[in-house]
Amino acid sequence: MNRTRSASMVQGGLNWDSLPLKLFAGGNAKFWNPADIDFSRDRADWERLTDDERSYATRLCAEFIAGEESVTQDIQPFMAAMRAEGRLGDEMYLTQFAFEEAKHVQVFRMWLDAVGVTDDLHHFLDDVPSYRTIFYEELPDCLNALTIDPSPAAQVRASVTYNHMVEGMLALTGYFGWHKICVERGILPGMQELVRRIGDDERRHMAWGTFTCRRHVAADDANWGVFETRMNELMPLGLRLIEEGFALYDPMPFDLSVDEFMAYASDKGMRRFGTIASARGRPLAEIDLDYTPVQLEDTFADEDARALAAV
């Protein structure tokens, strides 16, 4: 495809108040380097854990690092879809998005190396078939479909799978798990810093996904049905993944509660419906400047911070 114009040179320039470029600026302002995180104390804490505690923590980390690798690879077709749509601001943000996902792979691998976990970890995923279904089938299928069909409906399905299920439900629940393990016990300070850093990045990622779904729903109400259907397909699968992980341990390491995790994940999934639904019937031009998606993720972060402070 030949290039005929440059969006950055049109009259008026770029709209820096549009949500994608706000997210882009936010990512630049909050840049962090994985090499700056101090993992030196984590090794001693790690060695004091029981075998089952180390097993569960390794499993959780394996699920995270494999997931971060998957999304690093699978976001590429969304960039091409934004280019085809002529949305330079979104394309700029997604380049940063992909870079951050690659950085998350780096930092989880650095932590594993720091605590001495260097064995092959694939077997940790064999016992949770729902994980493989989501990350090895549903995610790449939905994202790769954009190379053939970058339509709004296909974008909504891809965003639900990536931003609302993988990030907005499963990753948030995983961070919750790390907080329960680390913060409540005052251990693994490097992991605590790691989770804080990637959580901040992921809030921007989820906000972009919510924004993308909202603008397509505002443009065509039929896309609300696409969003609703895809969420209803994936939420049971995500909850089953959590159940499968808990079923492997008796008693559960760190005194974690499957009911608490299921309730947390369900809450994060269900509350996304209202934010997307609020775009129905709205003028499309308003959506680009509506920061509701950012506010939702900030609300989740504030709730988690208050809950941890109360421990």
Curated annotation (Swiss-Prot):
Keyword Oxidoreductase listed: yes
EC number(s) given by UniProt: 1.-.-.-
Cofactors named for this entry: Fe cation; Mn(2+)
Cofactor note: Binds 1 Fe cation per subunit. Binds 1 manganese ion per subunit. The iron and manganese ions form a dinuclear manganese-iron cluster.
Protein keywords: Iron, Manganese, Metal-binding, Oxidoreductase
Transmembrane segments: none
Record keyword Metal-binding present: yes
GO molecular function: metal ion binding; oxidoreductase activity
UniProt signal peptide: none
Binding-site residues for Fe cation, renumbered to this chain: E101, E167, E202, H205
Cross-link (3-(O4'-tyrosyl)-valine (Val-Tyr)): V71-Y162
Pfam families assigned to the protein according to its UniProt record, in alphabetical order: Ribonuc_red_sm
GO biological process terms held by the UniProt record: deoxyribonucleotide biosynthetic process
Oligomeric form and interacting partners: Homodimer.
Family indicated by similarity: Belongs to the ribonucleoside diphosphate reductase small chain family. R2-like ligand binding oxidase subfamily.
Protein name (Swiss-Prot/TrEMBL): R2-like ligand binding oxidase
Species annotation: Mycobacterium avium (strain 104)
